């Protein structure tokens, strides 16, 4: 079944399988490149979307997995996690760091592991959904699986 997935999504599927996470990547008929579009396509609350945002901090990429209902307060987050300035990565930096385009960045399947922060608000949902490597692909998992998959640090991000 993974043969029918886009190449980038196959890398994500392999990473999920290696981590023992059963979430199956599904292909949506229309692009869901924002949390609101993904939530509408899945008929779920926008807060249950694990939005993958790539920032640049201390000369390296920083992946923030935030609830689709939140905006990241970069100044507050930098202080909470002991980082210097946190700024949005450029599309080129996102692609170089993740191998995936903006709007489809998965929490896994990257060329190298990324320092990851996971929004504590995602713990409120029994199931969350994340992008599967393209704007047309998504997969379900639990909060605990997301933290384990990414090796992320749980923090308040808004």
Where are these regions (language model features)?
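Extended, low-hydrophobicity, polar/charged segments
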Residues: 1-158
């Amino acid at each position: 079944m993974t043969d029918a997935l886009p190449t980038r999504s196959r890398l994500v599927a392999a990473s999920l399988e290696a981590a023992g996470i059963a979430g199956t990547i599904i292909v949506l008929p229309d692009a869901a490149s924002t949390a609101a579009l993904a939530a509408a396509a899945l008929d779920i609350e926008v807060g249950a979307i694990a939005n993958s945002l790539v920032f640049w901090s201390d000369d390296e990429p920083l992946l923030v997995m935030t609830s689709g209902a939140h905006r990241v307060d970069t100044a507050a987050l930098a202080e909470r996690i002991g980082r210097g300035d946190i700024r949005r990565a450029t599309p080129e930096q996102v692609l170089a760091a993740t191998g995936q385009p903006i709007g489809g960045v998965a929490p896994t399947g990257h060329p190298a592991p990324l320092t990851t922060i996971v929004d504590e608000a995602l713990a409120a949902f029994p199931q969350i959904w994340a992008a599967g490597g393209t704007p047309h692909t998504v997969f379900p998992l639990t909060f605990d699986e997301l933290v384990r998959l990414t090796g992320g640090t749980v923090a308040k991000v808004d």
